[in-house]
Amino acid sequence: MGARLVRGRRPVDAGVGLTPQPWWFGPQELAPPGDEAPFDLVLLDRDGTINVRIPDGYVTAPEELLLLPGAADGVARLTRAGCRTVLVTNQRGVARGLLSREGLVAVHRQLDALLAPAGGRLDAVVVCPHEQGACRCRKPLDGLFREALSRAPWARAERCVMVGDMPSDLEPAAGLGMRTEQVSAARDLAEVARLLVPSVRGSVVQRGEGHVP
């Protein structure tokens, strides 16, 4: 069966050229944060944590990406605290031919544009583009988290935190010794960020290169 059409767009070739490895968008090696940062890494889920999840579907174009309430303020608070932030996301729509690598980059450029006015920034993005069972990185497996740690050799798992909305986001991080925090309709990312960073001093800390190619 070929890739199916989504909202009138032509499908890309499903899974063509995929290897079992995750996709990393960012510096080859992340620079460590300053001494003031409360965590080595803050790992953030995407759909349902930062942006509105599309029921039974995928964000396949920039205009479909809608921020959840509190998301921009939450990421901005983490940025001001000097945290290194890494987006950790399953995107099976790639394997199903619903968007290409370039299409995913365009979606994440839009995410950057939506976060920037509040002062938020992501330092890197790590993606599982695979179908279930085709890799070791699709959450709830821990490959995405291991990839993030490998790109930050100075980071210790016990000084990292994962924020997500689903048990599949949190369980692999906890298994590696990371702290976990769950967002929900009653507890948005801004509230979780205030818990993680009770006070923020000064202005935005100078950041790394960012993740956009």
Predicted regions and their residues:
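Asp-based, Mg2+/Mn2+-dependent phosphohydrolase catalytic module
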Residues: 2-40, 101-123, 132-162, 166-213
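Active-site neighborhood of HAD-like aspartate-dependent phosphohydrolases
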Residues: 6-84
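Active-site flanking residues adjacent to catalytic metal/cofactor-binding acidic residues
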Residues: 44-46, 89, 163-165
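Gly/Ser/Thr-rich helix-start
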Residues: 49, 94, 98, 165
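Conserved protein kinase catalytic core
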Residues: 51-53, 96, 171
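Active-site loop/turn elements of alpha/beta-hydrolase fold enzymes
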Residues: 55, 90-91, 185
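Substrate-recognition element of Asp-dependent hydrolases with the DxDx(T/V) motif
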Residues: 71, 75-108, 121-133
